[in-house]
Structures are given as C-alpha cells and as structure tokens.
Swiss-Prot record:
InterPro entries: ATPase_NBD, Heat_shock_70_CS, HscA_NBD, HSP70_C_sf, HSP70_peptide-bd_sf, Hsp_70_fam, ISC_FeS_clus_asmbl_HscA
Function: Chaperone involved in the maturation of iron-sulfur cluster-containing proteins. Has a low intrinsic ATPase activity which is markedly stimulated by HscB.
Record-annotated disulphide pairs: none
Domain of life of the source: Bacteria
GO biological process, alphabetically ordered: iron-sulfur cluster assembly
Key words, A-Z: ATP-binding, Chaperone, Nucleotide-binding
GO molecular function list: ATP binding; ATP hydrolysis activity; ATP-dependent protein folding chaperone; unfolded protein binding
Name used for this protein in its record: Chaperone protein HscA homolog
Amino acid sequence: MALLQIAEPGLSAAPHQHRLAVGIDLGTTNSLVATVRSGAATVLPDEHGYHLLPSVVRYTEDGATEVGYAARAHQSDDPHNTVVSVKRFMGRGLSDLADAAATPYRFVDAPGMVRLVTRQGEKSPVEVSADILRALKARAESSLGGELTGAVITVPAYFDDAQRQATKDAARLAGLNVLRLLNEPTAAAIAYGLDNAAEGTYVVYDLGGGTFDVSILRLTRGVFEVLATSGDSALGGDDFDHRIYCWLLEKAGLSQLPDGDIRRLLTLARAAKEHLTDNTSARINTVLSDRQVIDLELSRDELAAITRTLVDKTLLPVRRALRDARISVDDVKGVVLVGGATRMPQVRRAVGDFFKRPPLTNLDPDQVVAIGAAMQANVLAGNKGEDDWLLLDVTPLSLGLETMGGLVEKIIPRNSTIPTARAQEFTTFKDGQTAMAVHVLQGERELVSDCRSLARFELRGIPPMVAGAARIRVTFQVDADGLLSVAAREQSSGVEASITIKPSYGLTDDQITQMLTDSLAHVKDDIAARKLREAVVDAESLIATTDAALKSDGDLLAPSELQAIDNAVAALRSAIAAQQTVAINAATARLNDATNDFASRRMDRNIRRALAGQKISDL
C-alpha cells in the first residue's frame, strides 16, 4: 500500500528527500508532538527538555498568549483567563456542558459551540486549541529545522462530527496541514503493533486527562482492524483530581471557596495523585486566601477507596465493547494502557483483575498516542517504504434514511469499518412525484421517532413517472475522519443533490450508550412496530393504486365486481384504522385477489391502445 507520489516532469522529489511530518496528540491535560527520525518515532522536547506541553492557555493583560507550563503556573491566580482542558468544550454548546457551573470560566452560548470570556475578548475552543497547536508546530519546526509538510492529529474515538471538524478548524487556524485525524486508541495500536509485531485481539484502554476510550482491535500481520469502540467523553484524570479535591474539602470542613483557592487545591490534588503512583502516601500542605492552613496526608489506599467508583465506571464501556465485538475476556491476548491516568496503581490493578492478566506497559502511556500518530504521518507524507499497514476504524452508530411510514432504512450499520461508502436504490411513492425529501438519521431503532436526526435535504427535478418507476440511488460515504457525506441521484435524468453533515451539536457518550441500551431493550417492540408500519405503507399504496385504476378504467368492471372491490377497500381501510398487522396483511391479500382480474383487463386494454393503428410489419 505504498503511496504514489506524482509531480510535474523534472520537479519530482529526490529519492532521499524526507518530508517533515509530525504526529500530534492534542490531549485534554497534556499535548505532545512526535516525528519519525531514522526509522524510529520519537517525541520532540522543548528547549528545556520537556516532552509534555500542558494543554493550558493564558491570555495576559499585555495582549500576549502563554501556552504550557508558563500558563499553568497562573491557574490559581488568574483562573478566568487561564483555560484548562479546553478539549472538553470542542464542538459543544452550553447545554452540552453538564459541569459548566463547576468551572471558573464565564461562558457565552454562541452558534456551533460555546465561547469563553477572557480579558482579550471572547475565545472559542477552536481558537484556544489553535494556540496549543501553534506552540507544538513551532517546537517541531525548530527541532526539525524546516517547514512541516503536514500533521496527523489524534482525537478520542467517540468524538462526533462537530468535534472532529472543530479540531480540523483549529489546526487550519494554527497553520497546520491536516493529513488525517486519527483515533487515539488506534494510534496506540499502531505504536504497539509495529514495535512489537503483535498479532491477535487486543484491548486499548485509554484513560487520559478528560476522556476515556476503549477499543477492541484485531491485529494481524500488516492489518489493524477496530472491532468495536466505546467510552466516556467526560471521564478522565481530571475527575480523579476532583475526587481528591472533594476529599480535601470534607477533611478540612470547607464548602464555598474563591476561584483561586479552587485552582490551588486542584493543582495540589493532581500533584498528590501523581506522587502516589510511586509512593504510599502524599502530604498536601497549603495556605488558603483567608489564611486557613491545609495540612493533610493522603494514603494510596485512601486514594483507591475514594476513586473506586471512577475506576469501576471505566469498566462499563469495556464490557460494552467486548459485547459489541462478540468476544469474551478469554479471547483477549493483551491490554494496552494509554494515557497518564493509567499510571495509577489502582487502575492497573483493576484492569489486570478484569482481564486476568497484567496490562502491557512497555511504552510510555503519555507518549504512545503521539508515537503512533507520527508513524501514520510518516506514511501519509510518503516517507514510509513498501511495508505499509492497513488501518480500519469503525462507525459507533448506524446511519440510514427515513422511508415511507416513518421507518428507518439502515445504509451503514454500526461498527462498519471506515472509510466506507454504501449505496441503495429507492423509488417514488406517488404518481408524478418530482421531488424527494432525504432525511438522514443515526441510531439503532426501527422508527424515525426513536433515532437522531442528522440532516435533511431535497432532490428536485425527478421526471414525472408512475409510482415506483423512478430509480433514486442514495450513496452514504464516511471518510477516514468519520465525517459523513450523502448524495442522491435520479438515474435516468442524472439530477443530483448532496449534503456534508457537520452537526452543530454532537452526541455525548452517555447518549450513545443510552441509544444502544434502548435498542436492545425495545428490540421486540421495534420489530413489531416496523412490521405494522410496513403493512400500513403497502396497504395504503395498494388502496391509492386501486383508486386511480377505478377512476381511469372502472368501466371494465361489472357492478358486482366493482362492489366486491369497494368492499375489499373498505375492509382494508378498517384494518388500517385498527392498527393490527395480521388483519392488515389479510385484508391486503383479499384486495389483491379481488383486483387480479381487473389488473389483467387493464393490461389488455393498454396493450390494445398501444398497438392501435399499427401493422404487424411495423412491429
């Protein structure tokens, strides 16, 4: 699968020229940039030797922008202008932020996503993320000594279209050419799979600063296939910090605190959590703004106790992903840990107990995603040799269209590998129909009312035909970044309409989970409802066809035959009103039987009309 490079004659790149491409892990808590040098992926440090760049941006009084450690140092004393964990706000409206009141930020609900009020004016999450990406770009170009060809940027597997598009917009604002967006767990699989030549079924358990993702991957020689994904976009190391913060408040008998004190205690909570990775106890000592002294000791066992529910919460998506992939714990060959929060002993212990084996930790969990992204960037830039590998991601929910009767026709099933394109033909419902409304839906239920509406558009200019004669081909295409395009084309005339779906607001992981749970809980009811709707649609179509035939050719019938058909139509209308599937199907069959001879006579008449005035020799 080596990429072909095409250039103007005489201008092709020299065989030895190495294009500068990087992989960027745009994280909630920390971000990194990596590249491939001499065949090995490496994370690029800053001028002080630090590999991690805190994902923190501060807007100063003199109009400057601080990113990283310098900004993080002011979390406590300048909380309104120091933006932390901006990734949680990407592609999100104010109504999507359940914990908005718990943050020190002043939000403005704007179209598309929230904006944050700072001393330098309102800033969108895209602009804040662009400042982080700009700093990483500068670090890479300084370290590599040249301009970047492009970057592969990682995102959580559960990022929706709006969040992915926001990430692309941030990169564009930072002057980066996005080669591809890559799911974080998949990037980790690339790093582990290539370094260790791993084969088999693996679980990637990614617990970062603000998001949790789990992916089930089948790794075979040269092929990465994601069998299933799940996760929680509002669960990560920040939540563990908050549990320690709440423990501090309880132990110290505190309630309401100024923003500066909240930031100070959260910073100390994070430091204590990290200290307990390698130590059995951590002391938390500080003086609050009201001169109250905090001096407490937190043990590793106490930390495990107060965060046990958070660790257990990560195992719910793990079970869901295993079920979706149709595998058991015994089928898993190994577990890859990703994200700084997986350093916590209680997390590693819980994961090991669940999967009955110690997790893999031979790569730095903070760096593994950036390393995998760098490897992918190296391929897309054309630097990789012929020993390329294939990467397949999956769609988290089914995608489909509304059909007559309020039914959903699934075009791309859930957990389909992407990129993918699938097409299906539809037709018109009424005679002379010249337009068709295309309603794109997402979800697992059978009825439109139970699924999520993504977009609507119309296909106009369909040539007038009898019902069922037109052929409209609808194509769904999901690109490598998970963005959906839908096109509808009438085959005989070539008229076409399309839409690229970038929803203003996306689904949360909890909503996705609820949709999957509902589909399982209501599967019998949904099947019954679908059968009823299909029976009604078929019945109403038959009634409409019969009425039209009676108006044009009713003279072909004897009074008794006409009465029999009228009675059958009336019986079918009554069955439809009663909403009983069996009765509707039986009444439909009776009307079909009653009109069989009538249909034959109509066909004979139409043939005679078509042949009138023609000689056999002309045929």
